[in-house]
Amino acid sequence: MIQIFFLGTGAGSPSKKRKLPAFLVRREGLNILLDCGEGTQYTLMNNKLGINSIKIIGITHMHGDHVFGLLGVIASMGLLDRKETLYILGPRDLKDFLYTSFEYSKFNPSFKIEFIDNYNDQNITIATFKTCHTVESQGYLISERDRVKIDEEKLEKEKIKDWRVMRKLKEGKTVEYNGKFLKPEDYLVIKRGLKVAYTGDTIPCQSVIESVKGVDLLIHDSTFLNEPSAFTYGHSNVADAAKVALEASVKLLALTHISPRYEDVTEHLKVARRIFPKSILPDDLSYITLK
């Protein structure tokens, strides 16, 4: 199970309805923050989302609406006496930006900060992919590892209830049971891991489409409803995001990075759903659960 909290779904500058980009991804105790617009620490604390429980932060690019909240989050972690290592992924300039800011603000973190290119553990991987913006930018693909499960329905049908048999089958061993040899490949099924992709700011481009194919959730730049010059600014219109979702055969599309010029987003959803019916436009502080 993966939960995604939409902490900030706006763009450029905050509006009354939408704060700046930030998304919290939770998976069985692992908390990942994607982008960190100004005010993210307040949103995390005010909604009891555990600022010090964040293990990994991924920044898509160095524009202020995506990164200006990072210093505050890290400073608050220090004030809360964090000891655990914080892992950060991001563009090449991010490390210099942070440590220069630490130097001028006389801040010395009480914990280790490690800059990484990707993340792997026994349950999940985080990879980056190239996006197409006006500055160096990258998206994030969070993938659960596939899991092997016992076909309980088949075992029940064959009246096999011995837990020792089940354990050996799951270990990939052939088991003799009531005069019959049970092969693991006949009783094991692969449960496909969930996948979540976040583009940050981007125009629709092939590198994004190829990287997000088949994901369970695509969070895609949808800055404008129908702005002819969207590509000039390195952003997508709603229809662009929907076409990417359609071509990449994703399961669900979340429109985000909504320009503050729009108070009513009813038309955004109508446009998206005409192209890709499984589209949503989350409000700030909404969340979804993938299973």
From Swiss-Prot:
A Pfam family assignment: Lactamase_B_2
Q: E.C. number, please?
A: 3.1.26.11
| Assembly and interaction partners | Homodimer.
Molecular function (GO) terms listed? 3'-tRNA processing endoribonuclease activity; zinc ion binding
Task: Tell me the cofactor note.
Answer: Binds 2 Zn(2+) ions.
Q: What is this protein called?
A: Ribonuclease Z
Binding-site positions, Zn(2+) 1? H61, H63, H133, D201
What highest taxon heads this organism's lineage? Archaea
Binding of Zn(2+) 2, residues: D65, H66, D201, H257
Organism of this sequence:
Saccharolobus islandicus (strain Y.G.57.14 / Yellowstone #1) (Sulfolobus islandicus)
PANTHER family given for it?
A: ZINC PHOSPHODIESTERASE ELAC PROTEIN 1
Tell me the keywords, alphabetical order.
Endonuclease, Hydrolase, Metal-binding, Nuclease, tRNA processing, Zinc
Which cofactors, by name? Zn(2+)
